């Protein structure tokens, strides 16, 4: 790798704090390094990188690598922000004959969702995990059947349900049994996707809350793995989300390109950046409109959606559709941007800038918005840090 590698300072600190713990290290790109460590040191290493070296846990996932190294693997991907910015991934191998590894969650609470998911999908048990409830799999899914193992099951048939009742337990950590319970969902008029929330209340005060998601989990990862080729997955990743599909397909194509050493032309990279910005515009305007709706300011909701229409028109001009689907390919972009299309897009962007500024000024001068937002829902910085928020 000809370019200077980033992350050297973190590796030096890691070797100094934990001598002999790192088994292997290697760069995937100039700013992305992976270290394989001894599994019993996992909680201490992640805690050290997270709190002392300024890392943020972006994602963690498992992988069935028995055909590669004879073991499963778990990856903790961290965005290092304190000094030199880079991605540092901590990898451990897990023995398939004893699929256990020490949980990081007691030391870094942000790991709880990822470790629950790894247990659901791979059957790898994080020993010491405080929350052992299922995360992704439904209550009637058979025990000892782990969907993302390579030899798991025949996916042409759904396994027979093991129960006809809901067994999931919602937890009220901060309250008591005397609290009233207000259920919201799984289907609710304000929800864009199914999600079941339980609010534990004492009078008008919400004491605690718990929730359950993944009601419409589609198994896209296994679908891509078992039924699609590399290029077909690009179109599937576009449809991970109805709002931010191009971001997902860019993440997928970039990963494949980095792994295979494919150099993407500069013009294709610029077109990707433009389409990502178009997607960001319509996504942010959508959520600003919804924020107005949630506080009872429906005039703002309608105005933001009116302005958002221009971003949808941008997408149609540049891609042929009102969403940025189907443009990404491994190695580049499916079609170029024409000069006249770019001129129209610039004109729309200039008008949107003026319209959005007017709407922001209107919001900031509306007393009801101020009353329902200023000082509301403040999250303690320490809790935010623990949760990688």
Language model region names:
Residues 1-205, 365, 369-372:
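Terminal low-complexity/charged segments
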Residues 112, 133, 137-205, 209-389:
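Catalytic cofactor-binding cores of redox enzymes
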């Amino acid at each position: 790798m000809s370019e200077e590698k980033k992350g050297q300072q973190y590796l030096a600190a890691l070797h100094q704090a934990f001598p002999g713990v790192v088994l292997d290290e290697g760069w995937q790109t100039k700013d992305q390094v992976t270290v394989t460590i001894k599994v019993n040191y996992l909680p201490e290493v992640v805690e050290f990188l997270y709190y002392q070296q300024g890392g943020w846990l972006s994602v963690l996932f498992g992988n069935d690598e028995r055909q590669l190294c004879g073991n499963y693997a778990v990856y903790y991907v961290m965005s290092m922000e304190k000094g030199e910015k880079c991605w540092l991934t901590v990898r451990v191998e897990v023995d398939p004959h004893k699929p256990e590894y020490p949980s990081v969650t007691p030391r870094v609470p942000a790991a709880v969702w990822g470790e629950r998911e790894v247990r659901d999908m791979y059957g790898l048990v994080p020993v010491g995990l405080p929350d052992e409830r299922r995360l992704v799999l439904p209550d009637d899914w058979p025990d000892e059947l782990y969907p993302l193992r390579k030899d798991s099951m025949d996916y042409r048939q759904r396994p027979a349900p093991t129960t006809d009742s809901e067994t999931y337990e919602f937890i009220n950590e901060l309250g008591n049994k005397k609290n009233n319970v207000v259920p919201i969902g799984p289907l609710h008029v304000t929800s864009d996707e199914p999600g079941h929330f339980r609010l534990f209340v004492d009078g008008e005060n919400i004491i605690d809350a718990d929730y359950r998601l993944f009601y419409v989990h589609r198994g896209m990862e296994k679908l891509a793995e078992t039924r699609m080729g590399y290029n077909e997955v690009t179109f599937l990743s576009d449809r991970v989300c109805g709002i931010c599909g191009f971001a997902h397909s860019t993440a997928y194509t970039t990963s494949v390109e980095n792994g295979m050493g494919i150099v993407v032309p500069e013009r294709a990279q610029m077109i990707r950046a433009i389409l990502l910005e178009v997607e960001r515009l319509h996504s942010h305007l959508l959520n600003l409109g919804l924020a107005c709706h949630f506080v009872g300011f429906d005039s703002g909701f309608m105005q933001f959606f009116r302005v958002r229409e221009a971003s949808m028109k941008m997408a149609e001009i540049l891609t042929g559709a009102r969403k940025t689907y189907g443009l990404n390919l491994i190695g580049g972009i499916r079609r170029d941007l024409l000069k006249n299309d770019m001129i129209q897009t610039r004109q729309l962007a200039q008008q949107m800038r003026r319209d959005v500024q007017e709407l922001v000024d209107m919001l900031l001068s509306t007393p009801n918005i101020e009353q329902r937002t200023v000082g509301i829902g403040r999250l303690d910085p320490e809790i935010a840090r623990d949760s990688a928020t």
